[in-house]
Swiss-Prot record:
Function: Centromeric protein that plays a central role in the incorporation and maintenance of histone H3-like variant CENPA at centromeres. Acts as a specific chaperone for CENPA and is required for the incorporation of newly synthesized CENPA molecules into nucleosomes at replicated centromeres. Prevents CENPA-H4 tetramerization and prevents premature DNA binding by the CENPA-H4 tetramer. Directly binds Holliday junctions.
Location of this chain's protein in the cell: Nucleus, Nucleolus; Chromosome, Centromere
The organism of origin for this protein: Mus musculus
Disordered: annotated segments: 78-126, 181-201, 279-317, 443-530, 596-617
Keywords, comma-separated and alphabetical: Cell cycle, Centromere, Chaperone, Chromosome, DNA-binding, Isopeptide bond, Nucleus, Phosphoprotein, Ubl conjugation
GO (cellular component) term, any one: nucleolus
Summary of subunit composition and partner proteins: Interacts with CENPA (via CATD domain); the interaction is direct and specific for CENPA since it does not interact with H3.1- or H3.3-containing nucleosomes. Heterotrimer composed of HJURP, CENPA and histone H4, where HJURP interacts with the dimer formed by CENPA and histone H4 and prevents tetramerization of CENPA and H4. Identified in a centromere complex containing histones H2A, H2B and H4, and at least CENPA, CENPB, CENPC, CENPT, CENPN, HJURP, SUPT16H, SSRP1 and RSF1. Interacts with 14-3-3 family members in a phosphorylation-dependent manner. Interacts with MSH5 and NBN.
GO molecular function, one term: DNA binding
Main location: nucleus
The protein's name in its UniProt record: Holliday junction recognition protein
Bias kind Basic and acidic residues: ranges: 466-482
Any GO BP annotation: chromosome segregation
Ranges of Polar residues composition bias in the record: 601-611
Biased segments, Basic residues type: 279-297
Length: 667
């Protein structure tokens, strides 16, 4: 116990020394900076006045002229100086009674003076108004936070105060004696005084008096356990105050002092907490939230009573779903697979609102809570995006109007190219013909994955642009599997017919495409037949070999589809091998004769007429063996892989087309 008491005394002594050092430093700082900086005015805190070239001016008030003797006397009295005529004839007590009648009566009442029942003499009204307007209670700074809480609860009502002599000259008087005053003598009972409202006009207090709340557990500095009015303050009691005891009251008083200037308000802790509230942000999309129900603001007690974690969680989720569903209007339909219409969306919302039982609870839920939850989610997502090392930037979404405009432009360009292609080849454009070009069907078949089943079915349209039913090339390619069956490949690739063997009018792109179909297998089998012909030849090889040939054909077909149809930007390529087959064939005399034989009106006749040349046809009829058919396919149908020097006419024609009109790929 003795050791504990010794430690407490040592700690108490150290605290006193620390407090004394702090006060010494503070006094030095005050003495150092208690002067104007450069041209700044020096404001007297007791009178809130400062000197100007025009005269004496009150802080936040009007100018006090030098000729005005009445104002000058008021300022002299506030500074503790008596007027020149009264300084010699009157003493301290007389001046106190004349200038501060209410304060002197309160002191006589506290000391038991028989003159306490004498009526108070009205003082100067100008002096009272000046103090009431421009002075603040700086002497209540040492009080604890309970004093300010009680002051806020009172709301300006009369409070019980105690008169004590001022400790230092820097303590500023209070705003007056308009409050009720009670005094406590050193040995007598407590005596109460009437309110100043019943006595008449209130009078300010002198500069050497301070007001503190009457409490036995509080001292002027907040740490003394004895009564304030029963003891005189000693130097040791001054060492107990700390800056934490003074800070909150100091900020409160300075805020009240500088409240006339909005830019000079000093924010306290309470003010900061009240100001930092989440404010509602205006919605960017005003047209999409017309169905929201806004509830009127209620009192804080009612709003807190309505908040229920269990009842408000589900409606909040549904509200988020509704908002997200409404925000899907700007997403393109081909990306989401949903056809969102404005009329159907409004109708579905009405049905959801009528059928959902939680919608009634959602209507009663304040809109502010929904916005707070949404804002909190957005902040969490933003924080996660900032923390994550990989920044995934979302692509800008295209509005439905932009998508439709994009498709419309592509369609116009494609139709224009198709018309030019048909006119250059001497044909009329027929977009409804089932035997139209393979590129037209691919364009109308919609966006499919390159490796899917729909990719092979290029002649079967799957989008609303065209609904024609044609044979699938995949079904024709499946006939390669069986032995003894005829290989009948019907496609919409090209309407040109190849020339007989040895003819120099074969298109280079014709040979390039055929070589691409045969570049992975060099066996003497009839695995690759030009799609624009219809010949009958028995298949040679085992079923497994036919299956392998089928998959190789399918792979090459997909590669050509990706190369020429999925990239419309490559329509004009300056390559010699990518000249349009129809343009090249239209320029050649041999091909023009075959084009005259074709009839685009009847697909069956055109498919029958699009056969090989007479010489080749007689050769196929005469040779019925598999070796002859394979030799026919290998020798007369499929040319070499590259355009060699043995075809000077075709290469020269390609160079001519490249120089005049530019080489263009397939549409």
């Amino acid at each position: 116990m003795e050791s504990m008491g010794r430690q407490d005394r040592r700690l108490h002594q150290q605290l006193k020394e620390s407090s004394s050092r702090f006060q010494t430093l503070m006094k030095r700082l005050i003495a150092k900076y208690n002067q104007p900086f450069e041209d700044d005015p020096l404001v007297e805190m007791r009178t809130l006045t400062y000197e100007t070239p025009q005269g004496l001016r009150v802080w936040g008030g009007k100018l006090m002229k030098k000729e005005d003797k009445e104002y000058t006397q008021v300022i002299d009295r506030l500074n503790g100086q008596a007027p020149e005529g009264d300084s010699e004839s009157s003493g301290a007590d007389t001046s106190l009674e004349e200038n501060w009648p209410s304060c002197s009566s309160a002191m006589r009442e506290a000391s038991g003076d028989p003159r306490q029942r004498q009526p108070a003499v009205p003082g100067n009204t100008l002096e009272t108004d000046l103090r009431r307007k421009y002075l603040t209670q700086v002497d209540i700074l040492p009080q604890d936070e309970e004093y300010f809480k009680n002051a806020e609860k009172r709301g300006g009502k009369d409070t019980v105060m105690t008169w004590v002599p001022s400790v230092t000259s820097s303590v500023t008087p209070a705003s007056g004696c308009q409050d009720a005053i009670s005094a406590k003598s050193s040995g007598g009972p407590e005596v109460s005084a009437l309110s100043s409202r019943g006595q008449g006009p209130s009078y300010p207090c002198p500069a050497d008096m301070a007001i503190v709340a009457r409490s036995d557990g509080l001292s002027l500095l907040g740490t003394s356990s004895n009564s304030v009015s029963s003891q005189s303050f000693e130097v040791d009691d001054l060492c107990n105050v700390t800056i934490s005891d003074l800070y909150e009251g100091m900020m409160h008083s300075m805020s009240r002092l500088l409240r006339s200037k909005p830019s000079c308000i000093i924010s306290t802790k309470t003010y900061i907490n009240q100001s930092w509230k989440l404010r509602r942000r205006p919605s960017r999309k005003q047209g999409l939230h017309k169905n929201r129900t806004h509830c009127p603001r209620s009192k804080p007690s009612q709003r807190s009573a309505r908040k229920g974690p269990a009842s408000c969680s589900e409606p909040g989720k549904e509200a988020g779903i509704l908002r997200d569903y409404g925000n899907l209007l700007h997403v393109a339909p081909h990306k989401t697979g949903l056809e969102l219409k404005s009329v159907s969306l409004e109708g579905s919302k009405r049905q959801v609102h009528k059928s959902s039982p939680a919608w009634k609870e959602l209507q009663m839920m304040p809109q502010k809570d929904l916005d707070l939850n949404r804002e909190r989610e957005n902040r969490v997502m933003t924080l996660q995006w900032l923390i994550s090392p990989v920044k995934v930037v979302p692509r800008p979404r295209m509005l439905p109007s932009q998508v439709e405009k994009w498709y419309r432009e592509i369609k116009i360009k494609f139709d224009k190219l198709h018309q030019e292609y048909c006119l250059s080849s001497g044909k009329q454009p027929r977009l409804t013909d089932p035997t139209e070009s393979w590129a037209v069907d691919v364009y109308r078949s919609g966006s499919k994955s390159p490796g899917s089943r729909q990719d092979v079915e290029t002649c079967r349209p799957s989008s609303p642009f065209g609904r024609e039913k044609t044979e699938r090339p995949g079904e024709a390619l499946e006939d390669l599997r069986g032995n003894g069956k005829s290989v009948k490949t019907k496609s919409c690739l090209l309407r040109s017919c190849p020339s007989p063997e040895g003819s120099p009018s074969r298109s280079p792109s014709h040979s390039q495409l055929s070589s691409g179909l045969q570049e992975h297998n060099s066996e003497p089998t009839g695995k690759a037949v030009w799609p624009s012909t219809a010949i009958s030849a028995p298949s040679i090889g085992s079923p497994g070999c036919g299956k392998d040939n089928y998959y190789e054909l399918k792979k090459e077909f997909n590669r050509l589809y990706q190369k020429y149809c999925l990239s419309p930007q490559r329509a004009k390529v300056t390559s010699c091998g990518r000249v349009s087959p129809m343009k090249a064939a239209a320029a050649l005399p041999c091909q023009s004769e075959h084009l005259k034989r074709l009839n685009p009106d009847s697909p069956q006749q055109s498919s029958q007429k699009r056969s090989i040349s007479p010489g080749c046809h007689r050769r196929v009829l005469q040779d019925s063996t598999a070796q002859t058919a394979s030799t026919l396919v290998r020798d007369s149908w499929l040319p070499t892989k590259r355009c060699k020097l043995s075809y000077p006419v075709a290469c020269a024609h390609q160079a001519k087309f490249h120089d005049t009109s530019g080489a263009s790929g397939w549409p």
